[in-house]
């Protein structure tokens, strides 16, 4: 990847500590493996204040000539309401369209671009793409435990980064789908500026909603039963990679995963219009 690049996303150090990891409210999907709740101890680390933005990813691509998985494949998954070109409905989730020409540069497909979206999260990036960015920037993807600890912002056991109060149209607090999913939205559908809404107790923005974020760990629904309790790094086997945080397409009727304990996963080469990432590194005190 050549010389190390400049990571153009603000970071903050998160203190070492112990927290309860998992769903303390019994609201998760059993197949996601959000339980049992278990104590985890982490050393201090640095974490991005926001998801990696289009501007930051552009700097990486311009410096390296990197070509993403979606660009190489010539196709990526786009939510139907903002797809700019016809696509093949994805089986069982027809609101997703496999859209030729969709990529991080063209998030809706051909004819769409990043105008006015420099400070939106980059999307249509695979786990492999995120790792390539991290290698260039001298950063890492967070472990699943680091992600949840940082997202909680010091609110141990809470449902959301701000506490337990559910978001509402009057007090949205995060970017999720409003209206009747998937065809009758009552507001904006898509990504928003990464600093929209209030930050959590550690100063992190939009840890839930907006875009799913890749983690370093492999995914297993059974992992919490045997997880290490000090700086866990996930299972040693498995194809799927962990996704955290939910996205602008989460809705209680379909995907109640915009909670800090919620887990999901995808294959490492998968790309969609609602998946991005943020990074971590060593804390100043650990360097």
Where are these regions (language model features)?
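Short, conserved catalytic-motif segment at the N-terminal edge
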Residues: 19, 24-43, 110-113
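Functional-site microenvironments in short loops/helix caps that host divalent-cation chemistry
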Residues: 13-14, 20, 24-25, 67, ...
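Short, P/G- and charge-enriched loop/turn segments at secondary-structure junctions
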Residues: 2, 27-36, 90-92, 263-268
């Amino acid at each position: 990847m050549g010389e190390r690049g400049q990571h153009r996303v603000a970071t903050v150090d998160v203190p070492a500590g112990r927290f309860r990891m998992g769903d303390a409210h019994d609201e998760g999907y059993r197949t996601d493996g959000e339980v049992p709740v278990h104590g985890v101890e982490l050393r201090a680390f640095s974490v991005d204040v926001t998801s990696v933005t289009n501007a930051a990813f552009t700097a990486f691509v311009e410096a390296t000539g990197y070509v993403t998985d979606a660009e190489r494949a010539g196709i990526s998954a786009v939510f139907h309401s903002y797809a700019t070109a016809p696509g093949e409905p994805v089986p069982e989730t027809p609101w997703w369209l496999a859209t030729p020409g969709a990529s991080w540069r063209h998030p809706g497909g051909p004819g769409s671009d990043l105008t006015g979206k420099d400070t939106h999260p980059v999307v249509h990036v695979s786990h492999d793409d995120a790792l390539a960015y991290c290698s260039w920037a001298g950063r890492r993807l967070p472990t699943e435990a680091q992600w949840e600890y940082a997202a909680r912002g010091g609110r141990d056991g809470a449902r959301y980064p701000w506490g337990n109060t559910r978001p509402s149209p009057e007090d949205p607090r995060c970017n999720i789908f409003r209206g009747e999913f998937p065809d009758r939205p009552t507001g904006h559908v898509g990504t928003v500026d990464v600093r929209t809404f209030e930050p959590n107790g550690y100063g992190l923005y939009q840890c839930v909603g907006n875009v799913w974020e890749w983690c370093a760990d492999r995914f297993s629904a059974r992992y919490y039963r045997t997880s290490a309790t000090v700086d866990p790094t996930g299972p040693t086997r498995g194809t799927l990679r962990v996704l955290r945080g939910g996205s602008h397409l989460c809705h209680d009727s379909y995907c109640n995963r915009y909670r800090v304990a919620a887990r999901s996963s995808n294959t490492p080469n998968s790309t969609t219009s609602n998946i991005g990432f943020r990074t971590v590194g060593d804390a100043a005190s650990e360097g």
